Each structure stands twice: as structure tokens, then as C-alpha cells.
């Protein structure tokens, strides 16, 4: 079986195909749309049309804009940050578009503005957001973990505001490398996007992946970045937020111990914490989350994206561990940072 970047490709893509990982190439002249992996012709609408499921990540590439001084995008009010593509000889741009797990299904507009000297060129693309069939999980927890009193509710709201403010101050430059890695080896115990019914009460969908592992297991940074927050929150427990630049964040929750401080620079594969069961958790596991310009996306989607090496970095891309198979699921953790 052929392996790519340390990952069993057949094994990995069988899992990732659920999220239709795609790469959209927007050419400045004819505007064709291509998919990664290629799934056949795509209907056109506006300058072009493509579809993506809730929770997926899209690579947007704009080649051959030799005179462009900046290229910016917008999708559902969120920024689509594009930057010079090192593999295009300095003439192209590349960036990430995240589709949030709760984005409204249906057609939405992606706009791209390219500054060409004193002129701005406007491109418009139709993105069809496809509804994902997320699982439903019924969980039984201690009452005080679900029904918060007034004091606990005030704490939770303050913690949410702390995170909101911190994540609004993203690094203006790309810090991450071409290859993301899984932060801990273990079994998937909680599925991204699952609808959670806690003690009979509907709660927010699960915005990450839970990976079960023994207490104290090393937790690694998924990629290069700067530690933006180290917290101890009511639901997520001890947690670390890593800013990878240009609106891309990774989150690591329920840690027994955090081994980094706010402001620290970290490298992919660096141990930043230990698996624990702090916050709202039923057993030791890591809640691993990702956000792309505010969109909550499946973290496993980042493992196979066709991104070029960051020429500003000085380290080789580390091999990513294989993605766990579906049959390894075992409900041992709760995870999450919301109600």
C-alpha cells in the first residue's frame, strides 16, 4: 500500500472522503474549477460553482496574478485569507476556506478581490454548502455538568468572551507547514459535528474530535505556531490554543497538564501537554479542534490538504500518523467547550 507523507493514503482518504476535501483552482483568465480528489465535472454559476460539506476545508488557488499586490476573499462574512503561493513562482495566491459545521445548506457567494495596481478586480463564485449527516449521541452526565447554576453560567460566559477576544488577534503571517499531524495516538471516542443530547437536553454540536488515550500521554502540536491561550475552563478543562497564522487555530482540551506558556513558539510534533480528564469529561482523552477564520472544521481535514511547504520556515515536514479507522470508535469521552 502506497504511503504519502507518512500516512496510509487509502486508509486516510477513506475517512476523509466523508468531508469531500477539495482544492479549487481559480484561474485569472478562464476560471475553471478543479476538485481534490477529482470527482468529475462541476456545474458553473457566476465565475464558477463548487460544493462542499459542512465542516470541510477548501484550498483556494489563484494563479497567474503577476501584478497583484493583494488578494482577499469573503465567504458568509468570514475572511478567506490568501497569500503568495511559493510553488507558483511568486505569481499566484493560495488560501483556505472553511465551511462551518453549522453553515446554512444552500448556495452562498465567495467573492475574491485582487488589487492590480490602482485597479481592483472582482471575482464571484457560487459555493453550494451541502448538509452533512452528523451522528446523534445520547450522553448521561452528572447534573452539575449539564445544568449550570448562576455562578457557573457567568463563569462560562466570561470564558467564551476570553476566547473570542484572543482568537480575534490572529497572526498576520503564515506560520504553519505543509503537513499537519494528529496530536496524539489513540482511538476516536467522539465524532466531529455529532449532535449531543445530554441528560435528555439538546446541546451544541461537537466541534472537534475526541481521541482516547491513557492519562498522561504526550499531546503534540499539530503544526508550527504561537501559543495564544493557556486556560482552565469549566467545560474544556485545561486547554491550549495555538495560532498557526492567517486565521488558522488548533485547540487541545481536557489536558492534565499544559507544558507551554502563552506567547511560546511551538513546532509540529513538539509535546505541549498531557492527556487528562479535566473539565466536562467522562474519561481521559484529548478534544482536538480546528478553526479556519472562525469556521469550526473537522481537524482531520487538515491532514491531507495539498499545501506547499512554507519557505519562511526552517524545518522539514514531519510525517503524520495514520488516521484511526471507523471501527475503533469507543464512547469514553465527552469533550467540547460549549453548552
Positions of predicted regions on the chain:
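Bacterial N-terminal signal peptides
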Residues: 21-31
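N-terminal edge beta-strand
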Residues: 36-55
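Surface-exposed, glycine-biased beta-strand/turn segments
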Residues: 45-47, 124-236, 325-339
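Aromatic/hydrophobic beta-strand junction motif of beta-rich domains
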Residues: 57-65
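Ligand-binding face of N-terminal immunoglobulin V-set domains in extracellular IgSF glycoproteins
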Residues: 94-99, 106-109
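Conserved structural position at the C-terminal beta-strand
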Residues: 112-114
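Catalytic cores of peptidoglycan-degrading enzymes
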Residues: 181-321
Amino acid at each position: 500500500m502506497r504511503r504519502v507523507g507518512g500516512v496510509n493514503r487509502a486508509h486516510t482518504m477513506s475517512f476523509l472522503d466523508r468531508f469531500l476535501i477539495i482544492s479549487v483552482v481559480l484561474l485569472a483568465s478562464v476560471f475553471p474549477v478543479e476538485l481534490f480528489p477529482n470527482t468529475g465535472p462541476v456545474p458553473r454559476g457566476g465565475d464558477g460553482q463548487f460544493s462542499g460539506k459542512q465542516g470541510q476545508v477548501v484550498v483556494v488557488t489563484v494563479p497567474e496574478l503577476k501584478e497583484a499586490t493583494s488578494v482577499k476573499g469573503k465567504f458568509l462574512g468570514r475572511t478567506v485569507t490568501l497569500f503568495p503561493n511559493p510553488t507558483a513562482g511568486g505569481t499566484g495566491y493560495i488560501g483556505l476556506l472553511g465551511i462551518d459545521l453549522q453553515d446554512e445548506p444552500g448556495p452562498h457567494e465567495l467573492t475574491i478581490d485582487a488589487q492590480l495596481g490602482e485597479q481592483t478586480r472582482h471575482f464571484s463564485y457560487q459555493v453550494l454548502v451541502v448538509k452533512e449527516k452528523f451522528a446523534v449521541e445520547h450522553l448521561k452526565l452528572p447534573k452539575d455538568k449539564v445544568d449550570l447554576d448562576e455562578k457557573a453560567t457567568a463563569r462560562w460566559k466570561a470564558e467564551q468572551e476570553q476566547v473570542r477576544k484572543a482568537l480575534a488577534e490572529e497572526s498576520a503571517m503564515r506560520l504553519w507547514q505543509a503537513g499537519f499531524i494528529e496530536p496524539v495516538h489513540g482511538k476516536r471516542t467522539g465524532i466531529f459535528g455529532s449532535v449531543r443530547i445530554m441528560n435528555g437536553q439538546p446541546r451544541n454540536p461537537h466541534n472537534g474530535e475526541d481521541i482516547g488515550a491513557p492519562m498522561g500521554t504526550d499531546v503534540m502540536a499539530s503544526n508550527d505556531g504561537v501559543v495564544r491561550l493557556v486556560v482552565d475552563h469549566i467545560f474544556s478543562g485545561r486547554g491550549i490554543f495555538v495560532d498557526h497564522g492567517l486565521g488558522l487555530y488548533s485547540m487541545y482540551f481536557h489536558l492534565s497538564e499544559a507544558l507551554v506558556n502563552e506567547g511560546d513558539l511551538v513546532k509540529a510534533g513538539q509535546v505541549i501537554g498531557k492527556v487528562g480528564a479535566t473539565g466536562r469529561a467522562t474519561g481521559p482523552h484529548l478534544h482536538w479542534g480546528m478553526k479556519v477564520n472562525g469556521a469550526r472544521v473537522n481537524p482531520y481535514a487538515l491532514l491531507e490538504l495539498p499545501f506547499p511547504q512554507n519557505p519562511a520556515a526552517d524545518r522539514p515536514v514531519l510525517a503524520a500518523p495514520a488516521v484511526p479507522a471507523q471501527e475503533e470508535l469507543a464512547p469514553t469521552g465527552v469533550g467540547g467547550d460549549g453548552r
